[in-house]
Amino acid sequence: LMRKKIEAECSQLDPQPDAATREAIARHCYESARSCTAEARPMLEELAQDYPLVLVSNFYGNLEAVITDFGLAEYFKAVIESARVGVCKPDPAIFRLGVEALGLPPEEILVIGDSMDKDILPAASLGCRTLLIDGRPWPPTSESVVRE
């Protein structure tokens, strides 16, 4: 699906990149994503030892395949993906599905996100605790902020 997305985006460009350039873009995106997830692995391993984890994401319909390919699926009790559940962030309903998957009251759940508008505010509106992980400068309104 990533290649299809890149093909669709490239088709809007003038002039359109050749096949080798499109392939290089796809390879770069894949390797960048793999690198980022590799950096997250130690944190996920540690958290998953003590807490049930649910992944809530706006994605294209293949998130479970991607996290399986990257070796991360084992850390998540459930994956809530916008393309599969029919609701997208910032709608709090997608976070409600995550709460339901955990089977815990919202006030016992910590939502960790990198977007104030798409993660923190909708999760907080359900009563979840929140943690913003963000390297970009904007005024924090979450309970806690972790900066790079």
Region spans (language model):
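A metal-dependent, Asp-based hydrolase signature
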Residues: 1-25
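Conserved acidic
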Residues: 1, 32, 90
